[in-house]
A protein has these predicted regions:
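Acidic/polar low-complexity interaction segments
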Residues: 1-104, 108-112, 120-123, 134-137, ...
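Glycine-rich, mobile lid/loop segments that gate access to catalytic sites or pores
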Residues: 194
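Zinc-dependent metallohydrolase catalytic domains
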Residues: 103, 107-121, 128-159, 163-191, ...
Length: 304
């Protein structure tokens, strides 16, 4: 009998835990089970602490706090054995894992649709011969870049920058007044901003506001990708279909974006919704089609 140890095959996927929506939903006894999902990503042999791979580089510097958080090493044996860090609002390494998992998931959906690898828009560099395109290997991701209620893609930095802020006392729902809300822990916000970067890589001129609809296209496309990503998690889909009895035109989480963020800045519900909105009394109403609305709207998010 041979005493040789059989070779262990390389895994196909890396499993990482993340929030399906926002951390706040895990406080609800009837929502916490579907709000924590396990994302499967293609196995990367060269993944470095950060995480850093062939597509993105997570850099966790916090300028407002003058802090730099230790990079997550997702190759640690203990983390591999338990699908990464458990979801946590207070652990910076989970924040790094969360943005990495959602950014890579969004990239994967783009590549599946396009049938090719995704590329970032090149960096324009002024040389003695004029402006030249310089290849951008990795998109940088900063989970704690801003101490404000904001998140955005920077075409100049080729980076995603996420903020954190204190929840408004006027906000409702499960937020506590003054608690810290992290944009990097919102699945919707991360997917939305990643889409801006991917769309810029597909067509760099779409980042230039040559007319009122260019930025609106960016915002609409990013919202649609974030919304459709909800439908890729079977447990979430089953739950919301059951709660609405199949009437997905009624209020449900599948049609809403950035639920916690919206409440934290003082709104009754999500930051944006594809289905309806709350009035001044806090009552939700389904949005009625209005062909004239586009003529009254110029702000990119609302127009998109």
């Amino acid at each position: 009998m041979s005493s040789d140890i059989p070779q262990v095959p390389r895994p196909l996927n890396r499993r990482l835990r993340a929030f399906a929506f926002d951390p706040i939903l895990s406080r609800s006894i009837d929502m916490y089970e579907i709000n924590e999902v396990t994302i499967e990503l293609p196995w990367e042999e060269t993944l470095q602490a950060g995480p850093v791979d062939d597509y993105i580089e997570v850099v966790d510097v916090d300028p407002a706090s003058r802090a730099f958080y230790a990079p997550a090493d997702l190759n640690h044996a203990y983390l591999l054995a338990q699908d990464g860090y458990p979801p946590s609002e207070g652990n910076p390494q989970f924040h790094q894992q969360m943005v990495y998992a959602v950014v890579r998931t969004t990239i994967g959906h783009f590549e599946q649709a396009l049938g090719r690898r995704a590329l970032w828009s090149p960096r324009l560099v002024l040389t003695g011969d004029g402006w030249e395109d310089v290849f951008v290997e990795r998109l940088r991701v900063y989970p704690h870049a801003l101490r404000e209620a904001n998140a955005y893609y920077s075409p100049a930095k080729k980076a995603l920058l996420f903020g954190y802020f204190a929840a408004s006392p006027a906000g409702g729902g499960l937020n506590l007044p003054g608690e810290t809300v992290f944009a990097c822990l919102s699945h919707d916000i991360v997917a939305h901003e990643t889409t801006h970067a991917l769309l810029d890589g597909l067509h760099r001129r779409f980042i230039e506001p040559s007319n009122v609809d260019v930025w609106a296209l960016h915002e609409a496309f990013a919202d649609i990708v974030a919304l459709f990503q909800h439908f890729t998690y079977p447990e979430v889909l089953r739950d919301q279909i059951a709660r609405t009895q199949g009437r997905l035109e009624d209020q449900n989480l599948l049609g809403e974006l950035a639920y916690q963020f919206g409440q934290a800045i003082g709104r009754y519900g999500a930051l944006r919704s594809a289905l309806g909105a709350y009035d001044e009394t806090g009552t939700w109403h389904r949005t009625q089609p209005d062909p004239q609305a586009i003529g009254r709207t110029s702000e990119p998010h609302a127009r998109g």
